[in-house]
Amino acid sequence: MPRDQHRSAVYAAEDQLRSTLEAGGRVDFFGSTLDVPAERHFADLVSIQAYVDSVLRLAPVQERWPDVGPVLVRERAGSSRAHYEPGSGGVIAIPLTGLPGQRWAARETVVLHEVAHHLVWSADDPAHGPRFCGALIRLYQHAISPSAALLLRAGLDSAGVPLTGAEVAA
C-alpha cells in the first residue's frame, strides 16, 4: 500500500467539522448561511449496522459503486480508534466502551469514514487518498446533507488534501 501522507490532514478536517455537526444549526460560510443538521449518534451495534445498511442502499451510492457488497459492523476491543478490515467482504470495527451517549465512535461521521473505506478500498491506493476523500464527501452529501459535504470539502481543500473529481461529483 502506498504511503498514506494525507491521513493526519483528513482527520483534522473531520475533527474541525465534527464540532459543527455536534449541535447542527446555521453556519456562516464565506457570507452564505448554511443549515447543517446535527450528527446522528448510535446506541449500539444493531443501530450502527442498520444505518450502514441504509447508506449502502442509497441510490447515489449504488449507482456509483454498484459492485460493493454489504459490510459487517462489529465491536472493536479498546477505545482508541475505529477501523476497516478489507478481508472477508469487509468489516467495520467500532469501539463501544463507555456509556451510551458518551461513546466517541458511535457517531455518524466516524461510521461514514469507515463506510468510505469499504467503498474504495484498494491495496494500490493510500487509505486516506483522493479516492477515499471523494467517497467520504459523497457520503456526507447523501447521508448527512449537501451543506455538510461542502464544509468537509472546504476543510480538506484548506488542508491541502487532493480530491478526485469523478468521486466527488453529485
Name these PLM-found stretches.
Residues 114:
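Walker B catalytic acidic pair
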